[in-house]
Amino acid sequence: MKDEYETIVRSGIKLQLDCPDLALSRHMTFKSESDEDFIKIAYQNMEILNQSLHNISPEMLRLHVCWGNYEGPHIHDIPIEKIFDVLMSFKGNYLLFESSNPRHQHEWEIFDQLKNKIPENKILIPGVLDTTSNFVEHSSLVKQRIEKFVNIVGK
């Protein structure tokens, strides 16, 4: 995909990579593996991805990671703190992730605890709406979700 990625970026479009292999696949494809083994697999995937992006400027790259957009209990989702270092190793500047569904809404605290490990160039893009619910969140709640991350990274 290296050539395709480079062609997309040369045309002036930012490249967003949707990577279910970094979170969702933990409880779908690799459910029989230990968390430690899964993290090794995720690091290998990230290394290969970063190699394929070698010739692309980080400001043109976005990575989207999620645990699946389905209405289910999500009790087997890998916590973000376990894959945090993998995500921070992404070559690109932009990191998009879920932060509003009931299973992951608390994980802003992990970003706060680990804020010193967030690279200076990393731009966090938290998902501030729950796409698995038919409830419409109040604008004040959405504002609070955004402010939590602004207070962590200061931007």
What are the functions of these language-model segments?
Residues 1-155:
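Domain-level signal for soluble alpha/beta catalytic cores
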